Regions:
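A short, Lys/Arg-rich alpha-helix, primarily the initiator
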Residues: 1-21
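Short, charged recognition helix plus adjacent turn
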Residues: 13, 38, 67-80
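Intrinsically disordered, low-complexity basic tails/linkers immediately adjacent to helix-turn-helix/homeobox/MYB/SANT
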Residues: 57-65
Length: 80
């Protein structure tokens, strides 16, 4: 798994945990529906830091919490 796949999986996981749809996330985060859709559908494989920060804010987590998972730690080891 690469960073892009991790990001998509993490957004989907957090939406499921909060019982919100990607469309609801776009509204809460102040990000367009097309931006969320393009990230989740693979059209945008490199969401910017500002976009990711808005998504995290909408999910009521920090960016540290977004990346603080076992999957990310494994990914980090693979990259090194």
């Amino acid at each position: 798994m690469g960073i892009y796949e991790y990001t998509v999986n993490r957004i989907n996981q957090l939406c499921e945990e909060r019982k919100i749809t990607p469309n609801a996330l776009s509204y809460i985060a102040g990000v367009s529906q097309s931006t969320i859709k393009s990230i989740l559908n693979g059209e945008s494989k490199n969401p910017g830091v500002v976009t990711l920060k808005k998504i995290c804010d909408g999910l009521d987590i920090t960016m540290m919490e977004f990346f603080d998972t076992e999957e990310y730690r494994k990914l980090e080891q693979e990259i090194q």
